[in-house]
Amino acid sequence: LGSKEAQAMVPNVKAKIKEYADRGDRIIFTRDTHGENYLETPEGKKLPVKHCVKGTDGWQIVPGLEIENCEYIDKPTFGWLNWDGFAEDDKIELIGVCTDICVVSNAIILKAKYPETVISVDADCCAGVTPEKHKAALETMKSCQIDVFEGKM
């Protein structure tokens, strides 16, 4: 589900990950992970674009973004329900694609699970399926008390 906006944000993401790593922050990559039968699944029937098939180029993290000691979550759907191991006083920032699918889903799940935790999204490090859907997802997250910002917070 790549887009020109997704490609354009990669330098911002790379800089953000370096900033996290330099501070010693916990870095978790999530990978939308599907099988060869994706188009036969309920999700695949509603979003009939074969993507993120485990082991393929579209599934792997963009070259140059991975760092030592990062963690991976291979999630079979938009949102991951097993966000465990965070303290209420942690700050959790999300970046990535697609703003209007995976990012918004996980931001809202995290806010529901950790209501006293600051959950934020850097809009400059996200991209949606379209620019319009990206903006709509950012507004939805703001409505759900997710701190949405651009660049430095």
PLM features: residue spans?
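Active-site acidic carboxylates
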Residues: 1-72, 118-120, 129-153
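Histidine-anchored nucleotide/phosphate-binding helix
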Residues: 15-19, 102-114
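A general structural motif
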Residues: 24, 88-92, 116
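Cofactor-binding loop segments of dinucleotide-utilizing enzymes, especially the Rossmann-like FAD-
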Residues: 32, 97-99, 124
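Internal catalytic-core helix/loop-beta-alpha segment
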Residues: 51, 55-101
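Short, acidic/turn-prone active-site loops that include or flank metal/cofactor-
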Residues: 78, 124-127
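Metal-ion/cofactor- or nucleotide/acyl-coenzyme-handling active-site neighborhoods
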Residues: 93-94, 109-112, 128-129
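Short gly/pro/ser/thr-enriched loop/turn and capping motifs at secondary-structure boundaries
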Residues: 101, 126-130
